[in-house]
Amino acid sequence: MEEAYRQARKRGEQGRRRAISQSEHPYLTDLDSLVAQLPLGQRENVGLRDIPLEMVVGTVTKGRQSAFSCNFMPLLPFSTEFARKWSNLYDIQVTEGYRDPVIVTEFMHRFYVQEGNKRVSVLKFLDAPTVSAKVTRLYPGTWDSVESRLYGEFCAFWRVCPLYEIEFSREGSYETLAKMLGQNLIEKWPQKKVDYLRHTFLLFKRAYLRAGGDHLDITPANAMLVYLNVYNQDRLLDTPTDIVVNRLCKIWRELVIAGKNDEDKVDLVEAPSVDEEETPAKSTSGVLNFFMGKTVYSTANPLRIAFIHEFPCATSSWDSLHDQGRQYLDEHFGGIVRTEAFEDCHDPDVFYAAVETAVKHGANVIFSTSHRLMEYTLRAAVEYPRIRFLNCSIGLPHQSVRSYFGKMYEAKFLLGALAASMADNHRIGYHASVFASGALSEINAFAIGASLLDPRAQIILTWGDVPAGGLAEAMCREGVSVMTGADMSKSLEDPTAYGLHRLVDGKVTGIAMPVWNWGRYYELIVKSLLHGTWDETSDDNQVRAVNYWYGMSSGVIDIRYAPGLPYQTRKLVQLLRNGIVEGSINPFGGELHSQNGVVQIEGFPPLPSTQIVEMNWLADNVVGTIPQLDDEPKVPAL
């Protein structure tokens, strides 16, 4: 009895000294002081629950605060009555166990003891996982902070699946987890599903800590989501711990990125690493001589690249354009680069079979050309770490897979100016098929471009899929005379779904369209591999995702005019285009206004690229709203 208390007190002193050395509070936090200056909401009687002891972090009142170290271990000498009571409780616990629950208040997913501090201390000393407690939940008075919103999401999760152990640090994660398990946050989960999640999480947590997860800046629940995103088809309960640990080691860099702040997760690479003028086409000595001595690849040992398309190129204009870019590589690099394509790989089994075939054929690089293939691509990249994987998307923070996409907002800015110069009544239609990463920046750039030529211009925004031929009719009903569709039509059934058009007397006339030059994009990425500058893009000491985000200045984005466009109009747009290419014009520089007010005032520099990618507002001359999102990850607009 005395020896146990002395050991516990020693741990308490160690915890107290450690806290002081780290400029932290050395004693228990008391809830009364914590919430004294905070707006508080109602209290709810949660009832009798088994709660995780690691989440019991303090006491309700200040009275017993200094009797315990911040780790809940005792600090008072053994000669005190406090020590004798602690020791008696220790004896009861190791001989027969406690029968009475402690009384706690839950606040922001942590527990503070009102009655039973010494019992909690004893159980923590014995490394017990849980304690029986009567719980009263204290809600925050406001929900406008990230922390309170996260707690609100936890409460919604807890009502349908009462597990305290599951704690996320990123908004939307509880709904993501629910969807992975075929559930939601509205209907109560079957008890079998709750038990399954509890056992699965505890198994994963043991493996995660065994792999060294306590050194990472993410919760075990966050790490489990990352794991399931890669190995989502495997039941954790059926997987030996050694295999789970080995898999965690394979995705370690993904876990490191998951623990970073959003602004530290992704490196946006906006300029090619190889000088644009230094191209084989401009070398008088030919392609082979141009790369002689600059690369380890040759016609005898080519750089082998596989392209995996989501749909058949014959029916998907998006995949067809990417495949034209692939063919351009074969022609452009004169045998130093050899490619092969795999089509219609939207099914996971077909995708993984394509990867296996590409690996057998000696592929050094694999491109997957749709954001919807990222999940499969990530798992393949983890399984084949020596192969370089890239996915056509933007803003997705994966270290194992690099992303690439274009600054389509630059082209939309020009199309907006062009639309305003030709609109009859200040009303311009804009149709977006999906709410995606980059979609709002494209809408806003279009609206800003239109406002430069016509301050009274209104952008009539619509969303969603429209039947073939129906977009023009829908826009006519809105009273617009000029309209634009998506960046890329999925098929040729409805030409008005793509590009900028005039609507006059029921007739649709093309004006201009955005252009993707995927051949040029792939050329720039491949040149970084041939020249050996691929690894210069990222710092191995700084684990970050790499997203290529090239625009007009790199030649990967442009616009194409319809025949017969007045030369004065072309000249105007060309002036704006030159400004974008040279960097003297940026749609998101200077004064900006949203539907809710001023975004930034005159004289401010352009918005950072990360804010453009993750834009969450609409310009003040847009008539429309942002759709309500479910928890599906945002994807680039196609």
Give each language-model segment a name.
Residues 107, 114-177:
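Glycine- and acidic-residue-rich phosphate-binding/metal-coordinating active-site segment common to enzymes
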Residues 382-405:
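Flexible loop/hinge segments that line or gate small-molecule binding clefts
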Residues 362-371, 390-392, 480-489, 508-516, ...:
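Periplasmic-binding protein-like
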Residues 531-537, 541-638:
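Segments of small-molecule ligand-sensing domains
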Residues 326, 414-457, 540-563:
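An alpha-beta-alpha
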Residues 1-118, 124-125, 170-183, 190, ...:
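Short, charged/polar connector segments at secondary-structure boundaries
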Residues 404-426, 515-536:
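Hydrophobic alpha-helical segments within soluble ligand-binding/sensing domains
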Residues 305-324, 329, 342-348, 436-440:
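Extracytoplasmic "Venus flytrap"
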